[in-house]
Amino acid sequence: MNKKTQALIEQYSKSLVEVAIEHKIVEKIQQEVAALIDIFETSELEGVLSSLAVSHDEKQHFVKTLQTSCSTYLVNFLEVIVQNEREALLYPILKSVDQELIKVNGQYPIQITTAVALSPEQKERLFDIAKTKLALPNGQLVEHIDPSIVGGFVVNANNKVIDASVRNQLHQFKMKLK
């Protein structure tokens, strides 16, 4: 993706985020955008909208079908994208909007990687520790299981890492022995 396209994506997403903040509908827009992203990820819609073989009218029809379950502000946003013939960029724009709204809400995904599945109590405890240590007001827990870490856990959130895995401890011990 070139710089011009990336700048367009950022400008469109910034515009929708500003509207959501201004009208105090951040959560509603975030839910609607997440639903649209799910549609893109479970269908061939991105390929259809970026295809040169599909006419502008057909693309417009596909986008209009997306608008049926959207708020007025998101409908207007989608109409602007269609008017400016930016349908091919709709999916990356929606992904960018989603990331920006996560930042606005402070709801960063908190990824916890362990060697084995955690109990609900352990998840809650690690989640609380992660929020405290990484200074996050709130977030969404995303659990990953990776047997290669041997034991312990690794927490990733907002570009910060807490690595309390046995694999990391063994690596640090190995480096000290050198």
UniProtKB/Swiss-Prot annotation:
SUPFAM superfamilies: N-terminal domain of the delta subunit of the F1F0-ATP synthase. Keywords: ATP synthesis, Cell membrane, CF(1), Hydrogen ion transport, Ion transport, Membrane, Transport. Gene3D superfamilies: N-terminal domain of the delta subunit of the F1F0-ATP synthase. One of its GO terms (molecular function) is proton-transporting ATP synthase activity, rotational mechanism. It is found in: Cell membrane. It comes from the Bacteria. InterPro entries: ATP_synth_OSCP/delta_N_sf, ATPase_OSCP/dsu. It is a peripheral membrane protein. GO terms for cellular component: plasma membrane; proton-transporting ATP synthase complex. The keyword tRNA-binding does not apply. It holds the Pfam family OSCP. F(1)F(0) ATP synthase produces ATP from ADP in the presence of a proton or sodium gradient. F-type ATPases consist of two structural domains, F(1) containing the extramembraneous catalytic core and F(0) containing the membrane proton channel, linked together by a central stalk and a peripheral stalk. During catalysis, ATP synthesis in the catalytic domain of F(1) is coupled via a rotary mechanism of the central stalk subunits to proton translocation. This protein is part of the stalk that links CF(0) to CF(1). It either transmits conformational changes from CF(0) to CF(1) or is implicated in proton conduction. F-type ATPases have 2 components, F(1) - the catalytic core - and F(0) - the membrane proton channel. F(1) has five subunits: alpha(3), beta(3), gamma(1), delta(1), epsilon(1). F(0) has three main subunits: a(1), b(2) and c(10-14). The alpha and beta chains form an alternating ring which encloses part of the gamma chain. F(1) is attached to F(0) by a central stalk formed by the gamma and epsilon chains, while a peripheral stalk is formed by the delta and b chains. Belongs to the ATPase delta chain family. This is ATP synthase subunit delta. It comes from Streptococcus agalactiae serotype V (strain ATCC BAA-611 / 2603 V/R).
